[in-house]
Amino acid sequence: LAGLLGRLVEANLATPESPGKWCLRIARKYDPGVEAPVMELLDQYLSDLSAYRDDAHLASWRHHGVSGQVWETLTMVWRHEVKTLDELCARLQRRGFAREDYALALQELVERGWLAQDGENYSVTARGDALRLEAEEATNRYFYAAWDCLTEAEIADLRDLLTRFGAALKNTNE
């Protein structure tokens, strides 16, 4: 498992597909080295892949010229996790932004035509939905670009090993 994950991390570092690897490069600074215990390696490689997924996602929407806060607001409404300013503020309280900041984010999204407002409720427009879907597709394209370093059999093995690893971790927590 560690060997397959390590190959993916190295392939992600080498791929030119995603414009930017800021999160991945920061995550790699915590690499414990190949001699580290396997659990530390697995933790590192999974963190690296998560960071690279963040890089891929950032690359997929940054060209729209909105802040991360505005994009996250769109995402929350797009996923049907919130529909009002109050719900948004409660859900993202941990981010530390003021209510006014989220009100401005919602206003910007309405002005861009990505959200529609009906009283206190917000919903995604067809345009906003198309942009968000496009970003998800681009994220996947960037993220999986380097996976051709593994054969189909190795990807199947990786899926199986990760599933078993996750089940084993779940069993230790019960």
Predicted regions mapped to residue ranges:
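Residue-level detection of the helix-turn-helix DNA-binding "recognition helix"
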Residues: 107, 133
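C-terminal helical/coil "lid" or tail adjacent to the Rossmann-like core of SAM-dependent
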Residues: 134-140
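A short, conserved structural fragment
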Residues: 14, 110-120
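Terminal interaction helix/tail motif
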Residues: 140, 144-174
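Phosphate/adenylate-binding glycine loop and adjacent helical scaffold
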Residues: 1-104, 141, 174
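Alpha-helix capping/termination and helix-coil
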Residues: 81, 109-113, 143
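Minor-groove-contacting beta-hairpin "wing" of winged helix-turn-helix DNA-binding domains
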Residues: 120-129
